[in-house]
A protein has these predicted regions:
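Twin-arginine (Tat) signal peptide motif
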Residues: 1-13, 18-24
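A residue-level marker of the well-folded mature domains of exported/periplasmic proteins
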Residues: 3, 9, 27-267
Length: 267
């Protein structure tokens, strides 16, 4: 089962509209089971947590948990795939009634997610494919995000330029964005990817900046950097600014936050 964030947005608007029609706070008894009683245990098992998007995501989960009287347990693996799988087992041992798996690698989360299902726990996967028909898959329109960014890149730079590309395989949203990048290169044969690099080592932006410095030195003819995750783009910008190339290289990204907009407005 796959649910896009656009559909979730419509559902959220519907819920917000319904809330406005209610007088005061809804009684717990009005909620569907098991939320008709406080203290439902839910675990949020995270793979990625660095950056404004993930901070906002966590704040949203915490706010919703508070509104429903949920006992929320947050387990953060900080990009350690084996640890994230262990944390699913920890959540099972805690006796939670629900688990949200946020990002991760299919190969490490598939079996862990199945163990949770076998234990009778409701599981939802956000931006990670656990290859399980019993688990709802929540995702955004990553291909469209990449397409819009790259259409702008072609509009700004024409259809012939040398590019650096920041990518880490195995992360579902990045893999979907990569599909669009591959398609765009096929459509515009003049676009040449001269360097591909990327890392999720913490701190992500600084780690990517270290890689980007070497890439810029090796490929001074790069005109465009496609970094379709804002922490990647922040790292590229650090390296580009340090090299004094901010006038000659354009950076295209996704997952834009307030701090990203501030960086975009810098001269």
């Amino acid at each position: 089962m796959s649910i896009t964030r656009r559909l979730l947005g419509k559902a959220a608007l519907g819920l917000a509209g319904a809330a406005l029609l209610m007088q005061g706070t809804a009684l717990a008894a009005d909620r569907p089971a098991p939320f008709d009683k406080p203290g439902v245990k839910i675990a949020l098992v995270r793979y990625l947590s660095t950056g404004d998007f993930f901070q906002a995501y966590l704040s949203g989960v915490e706010a919703q948990a508070n509104a429903l009287g949920v006992d929320l347990r947050v387990l953060d693996s900080r990009q350690d795939a084996a640890l994230q799988a262990d944390m699913v087992d920890q959540a099972i041992a805690l006796g939670v009634q629900g688990i949200i798996i946020q990002h991760g690698l299919t190969e490490s989360m598939k079996d862990a997610a199945q163990r949770a299902v076998d234990a009778g726990i409701k599981v939802v996967a956000f931006d990670v494919n656990v290859e399980n028909p019993k688990i709802p898959q929540i995702e955004q329109s990553d291909r469209d995000l990449a397409r819009l960014a790259l259409e702008q890149a072609v509009k700004d730079n024409g259809d012939a330029w040398k590019a650096g590309y920041v990518y880490v395989a195995g992360i579902a949203p990045l893999d979907r964005r990569n599909e669009t990048w591959v398609d765009v290169k096929k459509k515009h044969s003049g676009i040449s990817e001269v360097a591909m690099f990327g890392t999720l080592d913490n701190p992500i932006a600084n780690s990517v900046a270290n890689q980007a410095r070497s890439v810029l030195q090796a490929h001074p003819d790069i005109k465009v950097m496609f970094a379709p995750y804002d922490e990647f783009a922040k790292g590229v910008k650090i390296a580009v600014d340090e090299a004094g190339l901010n006038k000659g290289i354009k950076i295209y990204s996704a997952d834009i936050s307030t701090s990203d907009i501030a960086a975009m407005r810098e001269p």
